[in-house]
């Protein structure tokens, strides 16, 4: 989520989405502060699905604990994507010294998406010590997570993103999904 609109504005000027975001942010801050008061580790797993078809992946900020968590979850990790998003929650949390990762589970209505998100949580719970490393649910989740992305490298670095203006009428050609190899000069849209 983009936290930037909340900065410097009075709550009474918020849109309904901003009010919801402000309430969520307030809850996260309160939980984080309560955990810190007990000297507990703070970890955020931000679960998402997309409108587009494609494989699951993790997004992490530039933080070693966050990257370790994302790698343990077992999905491809995309480095640099969080830098293209304005004001993401995970970047803010990591700047506060906490651990955070996004799990992008897949397309909204795809049956596998819920499984990926659930399995990612099982592995994350084990990673932070809430569940034992060899819990049956965690073992099963690790196998399923890794099998869902066999043909994709474990870590990818986003080096270029072409911004598309909504006014251009841009339309991708059918048949493409994330992580598909593209040859130089090959038509995409």
Question: Model-predicted segments: where are they?
Answer:
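Structured catalytic-domain cores with a bias toward divalent-metal coordination
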Residues: 1-189
């Amino acid at each position: 989520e983009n936290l930037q609109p909340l900065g410097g504005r009075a709550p009474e000027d918020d849109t309904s989405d901003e009010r919801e975001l402000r309430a969520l942010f307030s809850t996260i801050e309160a939980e984080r502060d309560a955990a810190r008061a007990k000297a507990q580790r703070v970890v955020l797993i931000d679960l998402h699905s997309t409108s587009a078809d494609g494989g699951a992946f993790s997004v992490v900020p530039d933080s070693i604990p966050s990257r370790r968590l994302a790698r343990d979850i077992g999905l491809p990790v995309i480095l640099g994507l969080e830098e293209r998003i304005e004001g993401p929650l995970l970047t803010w949390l990591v700047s506060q010294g906490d651990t955070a990762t996004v799990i992008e589970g897949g397309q909204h209505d795809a049956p596998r998406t819920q499984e990926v998100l659930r399995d990612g949580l099982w592995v994350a719970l084990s990673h932070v010590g809430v569940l034992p490393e060899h819990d049956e649910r965690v073992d099963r989740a690790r196998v399923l997570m890794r099998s869902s992305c066999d043909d994709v490298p474990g870590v990818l670095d986003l080096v270029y993103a072409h911004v598309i203006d909504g006014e251009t009428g841009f339309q991708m050609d059918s048949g493409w999904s994330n992580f598909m190899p593209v040859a130089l000069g090959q038509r995409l849209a």
